[in-house]
UniProtKB/Swiss-Prot annotation:
Keywords tagged on the record: ATP-binding, DNA-binding, Early protein, Host cytoplasm, Isomerase, Late protein, Magnesium, Metal-binding, Nucleotide-binding, Topoisomerase
Protein name: DNA topoisomerase 2
Any Pfam family hit: DNA_topoisoIV
Residue span, Topo IIA-type catalytic domain: 707-1174
Entry's localization field: Host cytoplasm
Main location: host cell
Listed PROSITE patterns: TOPO_IIA, TOPOISOMERASE_II
EC number: 5.6.2.2
Source organism superkingdom: Viruses
Binding site for Mg(2+) 1: E438, D539
Length: 1192
């Protein structure tokens, strides 16, 4: 009986609202109930106001019953049922199992001066009962000993009935505890407890008797509590409501009941959360998480220790754990560092039901429905099953991704440089077109054309044409999305933050009224758009057609392929070439270079024609724009989506670089005349054709700007710089400012990618410091061109530093005779730089380089000059003792002779381990001073970058007190001052291996010379080499063939010049006899010369053959006239002049004989010439190195 102590706390009966809550009707947030008894139970919201104190009365009695069930759970006599009923305002709760002990309570009897029994104390005396002082492992929901008393104090009448197996106790309590009738005690073998009561409804704000709605609401709420209890007590105990068993005997059933209305298709995940230590391990928690996009905020139902608690640390623990997993999974899935998800986001689509017992908790809040326990209890002892978290997280992330997609669909941005068509978005919206201009200059052209309406009423105008700028570049949307397959099999395309915030693309979406969730398959869907089509207005160059237009097409294909299918995406095809014939005002226009080439071949001469190129829209002047816009509709071409387009979009713009690399290994197949005619006849362009021609051409051009050709080791920019330098400095090799020379290159070599990048390339081409890319720079730098200290980034401004051609090296490495034989790039119809050079030595393996492009990585480490010279000489010289050995190696694709990395200007060491070489820096240790002095760094490691990398290494800096850099641009002197007693510890922690000692390991004084030998091929595309030998072997035939071509061409030119000089000498001898001065005109004179067997010759071609091929020389040189004779002056007919010509003929004949001899020499024509040129290059390099590449 000691458990039922009584407290003298009489005032509690007066302060009735202290624990029960408000004593009148109020709005209770989240109040729910079960109104029907259908097969599928459903919790519905209760919208009417109710009294918290009344609900507390019912709740306290129900919690007492579940407490009793838990207390008897492990005893022989268990609680097998709890019967709850509510009828006509009367509430009843009964449970079997041991009843309340029926015994006299001495203390209470003494105070009351009558016989008082334990059941009366438990139900009628405040702060009395078993819940006043609970043990730490207690899992009862009751607290403070006031629960049942609240019910009694707020009841008109109540009947307490309990039986303990020996006696049955019945007691009536009336008038809110004012009248407590003596109990009736009778013998009985039953065991149960039942509480029946009629609350004081009227005083709590209700009708008396209850109205139908009040009865219905209260019954629904009590039914809900009964269902909650069913989940709490589990299968061993049956909960009845109004004589019918509740069907929510599990946490999943309870979760379904709560979410059947709001999220009938929600995904339910269940788990048992266990603890690792007593008393918590004795009471695992059951959890069900319903995940659905229908939920907009986190909600939970917690039945802990039988109490429906509204908040608690257990919920906080669950939310935080879920959030951590969801955030991690979300980031892994979306692969977008800029996308963040918050705790609110990660849990907003979850409804969690938690059921179970937690020992030692406290109840706070006015109604004692807020769970309180130290949060670290959950962190320390409870663990949530990973399978539950994984499956639930997958569902949550799927919903988050879907919500992001929908949310981003309505993202608004400020649309710059947009002019709306007057009829856009109106009844005639489908007649409007949005002109998407590449940039500001294109907008200016469009504005000029669209404002011609007054003079050209039938042309386009702002009535039906809007304008928007593409800003000169478009984001590749294909690489900014993540495709995710949800549990239901649906594929969600999630745009990353960069894409959704992209002002250009988002501006197009807003202006057109596009919806990412609409496919636009039907006319009804397309009719909702603000424009009937979009027309791309881009330059006719690779950047415009190949890149910008390709990316715009890819964007529409990615999100709205149906719009391309239905002809929504178009382009303005402007003339690329106009030919103005002298005396005519209307030009002949060509839209493709192939069309012009075909036309030009049919013309006898273009002497009276002016050919103008228009790669940029800004190149068209006003009168040409007016002409274009008169026929505007004829220039609008529609894109079509053919079968192969989908794959090609993926190849060129997707993330799989291997597919793109396979495609870009080959060059572009130009459009045929038939294809261009077909395009013009229907004004339709298949997307696949655009991708295979324009986009591929752009990609290959981009590669050539970033990866060198294996024949000359140069990118396109460096080749333009060299060609421009040879031309610019040909007559006078005086120094020029970098920015001035850059302007010359841009002008004469047609460089279109900005002066900043061009000037940077010029500076790099003149850099000659230890570790620079070029061991053999093509320019001599005057001024500060950067140093090893900052890896060349400390070069002076292009306005202040100057260059001049390294002519002694250039003239020997790139013989002038070769320039007439190389293929050339033509820009706007004019010859620019060679497509590639073929230097005397393989420059591609003589210099350093590194750059990525389109999935390829290019990395080379210069090879030893002596090894290269030995290999090339052995290949050329048949008398070389290694000649046959090398040819055998080439034939069988093996390596015999060495080809080591270059150690020029490097004071460190090179070592080979396995298939790779490694470079090592050097150091000196002063144990007395506790200092390591670094005297050389690994190859191509800039000083400042090296020091920063060491400082960022925390495990190294623990041993370092200070790093001092005394290095110059030529030498390395870095002092590493160690902390006391650090040297031995360094030796222990940074182990010495075969490949590096402890200090080399500690100070990172080693790097691997790993190569990626990917180069551009002569006819475009990429070739992948495995070894430097392969590059050499591939280069050799090109250089060898060049000597044969050079000699054959010289042979043809010499023969023609001998023919011409011989004819002139003959004419001098016969001039008196012919006496051409007596004839009236050239025609007569030419006839006489022809009759006397003088050959008609093309004097200009023979004297200056320049780029003419042997075929052209043989065809055109003998199809000339007699100007070479008729233009002779009198002094050229003198004997002395004739004598000089005869001597000239002899010299030419001697040279011709020599050329014929060279053509016949072994092992191939011109071998001896090559050897001579190798010697000349070597001599120039030695001089360059001896003079720091100044050559003086």
């Amino acid at each position: 009986m000691e458990a039922f102590e009584i407290s003298d706390f009489k005032e509690h009966a007066k302060k009735k609202s202290m624990w029960a809550g408000a004593l009148n009707k109020v709005t209770i947030s989240g109040l729910m109930g079960v109104f029907t008894e259908d097969e599928d139970l459903m919790a519905l919201p209760i919208h009417r106001d109710h009294c918290p104190a009344l609900l507390k009365i019912f709740d306290e009695i129900i919690v007492n019953a579940t407490d009793h069930e838990r207390a008897c759970h492990s005893k022989t006599k268990k609680v097998t049922y709890i019967k709850i009923s509510f009828n006509k305002g009367v509430f009843s709760c009964e449970n079997d199992g041991p009843g309340i002990p029926i015994a006299k309570h001495e203390q209470a009897s003494l105070i009351a001066k009558r016989d008082v029994y334990v059941p009366e104390v438990a139900s009628c005396h405040f702060l009395a009962g078993t819940n006043i002082n609970k043990a730490k492992d207690c899992i009862k929901g009751g607290t403070n000993g006031v629960g049942l008393k609240l019910a009694m104090v707020h009841s008109q009448w109540a009947i307490l009935t309990t039986a303990d197996g020996a006696q049955k106790y019945v007691q009536h309590i009336n008038q809110r505890l004012d009248i407590i009738e003596p109990p009736t005690i009778t013998p009985s073998r039953e065991m149960f407890t039942r509480i029946e009561l009629m609350p004081v409804y009227q005083e709590l704000g209700y009708a008396e008797p209850l109205s139908e709605t009040e009865q219905a609401d209260l019954s629904a709420w009590i039914y809900l509590r009964a269902c909650q209890c069913a989940a709490y007590v589990g299968k061993g105990t049956t909960i009845y409501y109004n004589e019918k068993p509740c069907r929510t005997g599990s946490v999943m059933a309870l979760a379904k009941m709560y979410t059947l209305l709001s999220a009938p298709n929600g995904t339910i995940h269940t788990a048992t959360i266990k603890a690792d230590a007593k008393p918590y391990s004795l009471h695992p928690l059951q959890v069900a998480a319903v995940v659905s996009p229908k939920f907009k905020k986190f909600e939970h139902v917690s039945i802990i220790n039988g109490v429906n608690c509204v908040k608690g640390e257990h919920v906080t623990f669950l939310k935080k754990t879920i959030n951590e997993i969801v955030v991690k999974k979300f980031q892994q899935t979306i692969k977008d560092k800029n996308r963040k998800t918050t705790l609110r986001d990660s849990c907003s689509n979850i409804f969690i039901v938690i059921v179970g017992s937690i020992p030692g908790i406290e109840w706070t809040g006015q109604r004692k429905d807020e769970l309180s326990i130290a949060e670290n209890v959950f962190k320390t002892h409870y663990s949530i099953p990973s399978s539950f978290l994984t499956s639930m997280t997958k569902s949550i992330v799927d919903i988050l991704l879907q919500s992001i997609s929908k949310k981003d669909n309505h993202k608004q941005v400020d649309v710059d440089k947009y002019t709306r068509a007057r009829n856009a978005g109106g009844k005639r919206a489908q007649d409007c077109m949005l002109l998407a201009a590449e940039g500001d200059s294109a907008l200016s052209l469009l504005r000029t054309g669209l404002t011609l309406g007054k003079s050209n009423p039938s042309g386009p105008s702002f009535d039906f044409c809007g304008m928007i700028s593409l800003g000169g570049v478009i984001m590749n949307a294909c690489k900014k999305v993540t495709n995710i397959t949800t549990d239901s099999g649906e594929t969600i395309m999630v745009r990353n933050e960069q894409l959704t915030n992209n002002k250009v693309l988002q501006g197009i979406v807003q202006v057109l009224g596009l919806d990412f969730n609409c496919h636009y398959k039907t006319q009804e869907e397309r009719a909702k758009l603000r424009y009937g089509c979009i027309v791309a207005c881009v330059d006719q160059d690779l950047d415009g057609c190949g890149k910008i237009l390709g990316l715009l097409l890819a964007y529409f294909h990615l999100f709205w392929p149906q719009l391309i299918i239905h002809g929504f995406v178009k382009r303005l095809l402007t003339p690329l070439i106009r030919v103005y014939e002298k005396g005519k005002t209307v030009p002949v226009e060509f839209y493709y270079e192939q069309e012009f080439d075909a036309w030009a071949k049919k013309q006898t001469s273009l002497a009276n024609h002016t050919v103008k190129y228009y790669k940029g829209l800004a190149a068209h002047d006003t009168h040409e724009v007016k002409s274009m816009f008169k026929h505007f509709d004829n220039m609008v071409y529609t894109f079509t989506l053919d079968d192969s387009a989908k794959e090609l979009f993926h190849i060129y713009f997707g993330g799989e670089s291997e597919l793109r690399k396979r495609e870009l290994c080959t060059g572009v197949v130009p459009l045929t005349e038939t294809q261009t005619q077909s395009i013009h006849s229907v004004r339709r362009i298949p997307c696949s054709l655009h991708l295979q021609v324009d986009t591929k051409a752009y990609k290959l051009d981009a590669i050539e700007r970033q990866i060198p050709n294996f024949l000359d080791g140069m990118t396109r920019a460096r080749r333009k710089i060299l060609a421009g330098g040879v031309k610019c400095f040909a007559s006078n090799n005086r120094e020029r400012k970098v920015f001035q020379f850059g302007g010359y290159v841009a002008d004469h070599m047609f460089y279109h990618h900005g002066d900043m990048s061009l000037n940077t390339s010029i500076i790099k081409a003149a850099q000659y410091y230890p570790g620079s890319s070029h061991l053999y720079p093509v320019f001599i730098g005057i001024g500060s061109f950067g140093s090893r200290h900052l890896g060349g980034k400390d070069a002076g401004s292009p306005r202040y530093i100057s260059v001049q051609l390294a002519s002694e090296f250039i003239k020997t490495m790139f013989p002038a005779e070769d320039s007439w034989l190389l293929p050339y790039v033509f820009e706007d119809g004019q010859r620019a730089e060679p497509e590639y050079y073929v230097p005397v030595l393989p420059l591609a393996i003589m210099e350093y380089g590194a750059n990525p492009s389109e999935g390829w990585k290019y990395t080379t480490w210069a090879r030893q000059l002596e090894d290269i010279l030995a290999l090339v000489r052995a290949y050329v010289d048949k008398n070389n003792p290694k000649h046959e050995l090398l040819h055998y190696a080439i034939k069988h694709k093996i390596t015999i002779l060495p080809l080591r990395p270059s150690n020029y200007n490097f004071k460190g060491h090179l070592k080979r381990f396995g298939q790779y070489y490694y470079s090592y820096g050097t150091y000196v240790i002063s144990e007395q001073r506790n200092i390591i002095t670094i005297t050389e760094l690994p190859l191509r490691v800039p000083t400042v970058a090296y020091i920063e990398s060491i400082k960022k290494s925390s495990n190294r800096m623990t041993f370092i007190e200070e790093i001092i850099d005394y290095s110059s641009s030529e030498t390395i002197e870095i002092l590493v001052k160690l902390k006391p007693n650090s040297l031995n510890r360094i030796m222990e922690e940074f182990k010495c291996t075969e490949e590096q000692d402890s200090i080399e390991n500690f100070l990172r004084l080693r790097n691997c010379l790993h190569s990626h030998l990917n180069f551009v091929k002569p006819k475009g595309g990429i070739i992948e080499f495995n070894t430097y030998y392969e590059i050499l072997y591939a280069w050799l035939p090109y250089r060898r063939e060049l000597y044969q071509k050079r000699l054959m061409r010289e042979h043809a030119v010499l023969k023609l010049r001998i023919i011409m000089e011989t004819a002139i000498v003959r004419y001098i001898n016969e001039s008196a006899e012919l006496n051409l001065s007596h004839y009236e005109d050239e025609k007569e004179a030419s006839r006489i010369l022809s009759e006397h067997g003088f050959p008609p010759l093309n004097q200009t071609l023979i004297i200056s053959p320049e780029f003419a091929s042997i075929e052209e020389l043989n065809q055109k040189a003998l199809q000339g006239c007699y100007t070479y004779i008729l233009s002779l002056q009198a002094r050229e007919l003198l004997i002395a002049a004739k004598t000089r010509r005869v001597e000239k003929i002899k010299k030419m004949q001697a040279r011709l004989d020599k050329v014929e001899q060279l053509l016949q020499e072994s092992p191939f024509p011109g071998a001896s010439v090559w050897l001579e040129e190798i010697d000349a290059v070597e001599k120039a390099i030695i001089k360059g190195r001896n003079t720091q590449w100044k050559f003086h």
